[in-house]
């Protein structure tokens, strides 16, 4: 790996972490509770897991310079991976797969603008 590629990867990591922090603050402002950040399950990573009362929220955070570019980063295969990982997480909940849950997408762009798209894929 070249030094430039390593630097780009590191910058992407920091940008992703910053976007996740912005998303966390947006959810906390709505009264939700953060359960896990960057939870890794058997099918991959979930950016954020939160609770809103009895409901578990799985959030995928996408960031870019504009809202449209952030939205364009959402890929069906990736969302299926998040959905599968969410199922694995729910297995540890008292109600298992019967736990109320939803899958959100959080778009972060510009100077920290944020949009939470609740139940983005209609699962849950």
Swiss-Prot record:
Signal sequence range: none
InterPro entries associated with the record: Restrct_endonuc-II-like, tRNA_endonuc-like_dom_sf, UPF0102_YraN-like
Gene3D superfamilies per UniProt: 3.40.1350.10
Pfam families to which the protein is assigned, alphabetical: UPF0102
SUPFAM superfamilies noted in UniProt: Restriction endonuclease-like (SSF52980)
Single GO MF descriptor: nucleic acid binding
Family under the similarity heading: Belongs to the UPF0102 family.
Protein's recorded name: UPF0102 protein TM1040_0449
